[in-house]
């Protein structure tokens, strides 16, 4: 009889684990697919789209001078976009990456505490607006988060299993994730602190050291190449307390209000959750803190580079909620149920951090002996997460609007298709905004790219090589109207770019042309310039010369 009872308890526990892991993944899958086609890509997504559609030799050639840090992702997207080159397909890997991360966060909660903690943690991760944002981004960050969550789960298995093969699985997963984005290397510091808090034996440290060595060996060539391309992150600024505050708000299920403070309180309560706190707290705090600290010397910080650290927040909040539910169950013991989702050994969720104990069949068979608040507590937690999601619905709707991204190249292209006449010349200022025409070539099929000398795929560059300043000036002398797709900030400020060809573009349109039509989409402005009358052009040229001389003296 005892054997049959244990068998039934084990089967119920397995079913509870499956439910806890599957439900959050399905939830974020639905959220991610909702409004996935926004009707236009923004700049970074267009880079993914264009590079992914090149041949493998062309991608390899490009990576020698640009975006080596994203090389593995571009090769992956080359395979994906071969199925169908479209905006929805471009973003689908991120949707599935977010779903995988939610399931893996739930699996961590199940492994470290019990199924309902995993269910709550996975759901909290799924409904956090930041998760939904990057689930709909045609970039690598959602996949990176999935890789880090998988590596963290493999770390626990390696610690508990004590086999050499498990450490190679852990090191391999983390190495591949580092190739998706090199900032993942900071996870090694978080995992090292986790092992220290768990007080693991020397053999575990040796296994982890070998795995970390594998990660370093794989990552070193990428770091060396990316150092040569460090100018790509020259736009980043030194982060301050305001960026840290924004990150805290983004890592919680709601950025402000009652839900925010309740979530923070539960996370604080979760700090006493034993093994889970030893895993979640270093993951949540250490990578962002290290990157912000390094960025005080050399700016490298951006929120998306540490998106993977978000997984620690729902784990702590779910563990805190579990401890609160257990306390309520002790006050009203008659409400304690027998749902496997709510069962678990109290020593797993409430003990101080200590040595990791193997997680096996015996824990499942004896779990029903622990204190539980049962199905009612589990469903109450699920309902609370659902209410938090409802409160965040305005944020989700806003995030799915085309105007919420830095720009909408699709909208700019639609305006170009409507307004450009056959044979009209077009300038891109700076040249990287040629991405607009390359991403939506049909919209610019009537236009003449007056500055382009050699295409991007042929030259091994992203947006091609442009003609010389003198040749461009001669070409522009023969046109009476020219369209400009330019960076809004450059056009507003009038500051001369560093590149000579870019300076000629700006100088000629300011001296010899007048802006007539204007369409702005975030960072991108689409303008029509028509040639000034002769007398006006002479006055404008004189004024421009004086202005340029003044700038040179200053």
Predicted regions and their residues:
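Serine-biased, low-complexity intrinsically disordered segments, primarily in secretory-pathway proteins
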Residues: 536, 541-550
């Amino acid at each position: 009889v005892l054997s049959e009872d244990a068998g039934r308890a084990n089967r119920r526990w397995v079913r509870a684990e499956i439910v806890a892991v599957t439900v959050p993944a399905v939830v974020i899958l639905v959220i991610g697919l909702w409004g996935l086609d926004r009707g236009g890509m923004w700049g970074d997504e267009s880079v993914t789209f264009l590079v992914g559609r090149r041949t493998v030799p062309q991608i390899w050639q490009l990576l020698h001078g640009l975006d080596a840090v994203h090389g593995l992702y571009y090769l992956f997207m080359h395979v994906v976009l071969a199925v169908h080159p479209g905006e929805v397909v471009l973003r689908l890997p991120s949707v599935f990456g977010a779903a995988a991360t939610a399931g893996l966060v739930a699996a961590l909660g199940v492994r470290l505490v019990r199924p309902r903690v995993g269910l709550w943690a996975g759901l909290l991760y799924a409904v956090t607006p930041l998760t939904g944002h990057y689930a709909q981004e045609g970039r690598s960050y959602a996949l990176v988060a999935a890789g880090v969550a998988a590596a963290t789960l493999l770390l626990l298995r390696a610690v508990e299993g004590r086999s050499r093969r498990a450490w190679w699985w852990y090191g391999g997963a983390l190495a591949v994730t580092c190739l998706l984005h090199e900032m993942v290397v900071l996870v090694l510091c978080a995992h090292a602190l986790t092992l220290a808090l768990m007080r693991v034996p020397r053999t575990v440290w040796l296994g982890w050291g070998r795995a970390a060595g594998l990660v370093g060996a794989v990552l070193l060539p990428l770091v060396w190449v990316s150092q040569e391309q460090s100018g790509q992150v020259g736009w980043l600024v030194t982060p301050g307390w305001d960026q840290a505050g924004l990150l805290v708000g983004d890592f919680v299920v709601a950025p402000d209000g009652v839900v925010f403070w309740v979530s923070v309180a539960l996370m604080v309560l979760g700090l006493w959750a034993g093994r889970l706190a030893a895993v979640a707290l270093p993951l949540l705090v250490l990578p962002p803190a290290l990157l912000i600290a390094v960025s005080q010397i050399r700016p490298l910080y951006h929120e998306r580079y540490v998106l993977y650290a978000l997984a620690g927040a729902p784990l702590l909040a779910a563990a805190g909620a579990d401890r609160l539910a257990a306390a309520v169950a002790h006050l009203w013991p008659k409400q304690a149920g027998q749902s496997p989702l709510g069962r678990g050994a109290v020593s797993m969720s409430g003990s101080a951090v200590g040595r990791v104990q193997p997680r096996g069949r015996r824990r499942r068979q004896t779990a029903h002996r622990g204190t539980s608040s049962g199905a009612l507590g589990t469903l109450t937690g699920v309902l609370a997460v659902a209410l938090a999601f409802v409160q965040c619905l305005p944020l989700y709707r806003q995030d799915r609007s085309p105007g919420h991204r830095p720009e909408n190249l699709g909208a700019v292209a639609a305006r170009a298709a409507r307004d450009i006449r056959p044979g009209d010349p077009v300038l891109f200022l700076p040249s990287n905004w040629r991405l607009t025409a390359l991403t939506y070539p049909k919209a610019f099929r009537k236009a003449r790219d007056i500055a382009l000398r050699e295409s991007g795929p042929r030259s091994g560059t992203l947006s091609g090589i442009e003609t010389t300043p003198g040749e461009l000036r001669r070409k522009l002398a023969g046109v009476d109207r020219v369209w400009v797709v330019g960076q809004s900030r450059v056009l507003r400020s009038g500051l001369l770019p560093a590149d000579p060809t870019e300076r000629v573009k700006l100088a000629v349109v300011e001296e010899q042309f007048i802006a007539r039509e204007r369409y702005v989409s975030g960072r991108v402005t689409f303008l029509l310039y028509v040639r000034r009358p002769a007398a006006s052009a002479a006055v404008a040229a004189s004024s421009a010369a004086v202005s340029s001389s003044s700038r040179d003296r200053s």
